[in-house]
């Protein structure tokens, strides 16, 4: 998780 601290899905590679 390095993308969004708010949205773990986005950091994980989720849409």
UniProtKB/Swiss-Prot annotation:
Q: Name one GO cellular component term.
A: plasma membrane
Keywords in alphabetical order, please. Answer: Cell membrane, Lipoprotein, Membrane, Methylation, Pheromone, Prenylation
Q: What is the membrane topology noted in the UniProt record heading this document?
A: Lipid-anchor
GO MF terms on file?
pheromone activity
Lipid-modified residues of type S-12-hydroxyfarnesyl cysteine are: 15
Location in the cell: Cell membrane
Mark the residues carrying the PTM Cysteine methyl ester.
15
Write out the function statement from the record.
Tremerogen A-I is produced by the a mating-type cells and induces formation of conjugation tubes in a mating-type cells.
Q: What is this protein called?
A: Tremerogen A-I
Provide the species name.
Answer: Tremella brasiliensis
């Amino acid at each position: 998780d390095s993308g969004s601290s708010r949205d773990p899905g986005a950091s994980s590679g989720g849409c």
